[in-house]
Amino acid sequence: MSDKLMNTLQRLQQLRQRELNQATSQLAQQKQLCQRYQNNINALGSLTHFALMPVAGAALMTNSASYKRNIQRVIDWQKQEQVLANIEAGKLQTHLQQQACREKIVAVVLEQQQQQQQVAQGRREQKITDGLAAQCWQRRQAG
């Protein structure tokens, strides 16, 4: 196996690892976004509980109802955004798994090639050792 091919495999593995790291980072950011939506929904939900207190007067009741309605619209919008964010997180999770598989394949191939290269180097060294031993033996026999 040539050094050029080994260098190419090593560079490919580095690229795959970088892609895997980017996919991991993107997924983490997306999960944080999903959590922010959930936190927003919870906070907005608590605002509607304050509006449930009894109010006196028609104007205050109308104002309270309008407030609750508007808060509920924002909650519904946040829930829709959360669903979309969860879908995107699922896609990113799938992409991450694909990137991990691609990186692992290259890592395994590189490791196999390195092992083959070490075995070949060991054979070359053994041939040299055997050749030197044969020369020594022949010199002793001749001398």
Summary of predicted features, one role per range:
Residues 1-143:
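Charge-rich amphipathic alpha-helical interaction elements
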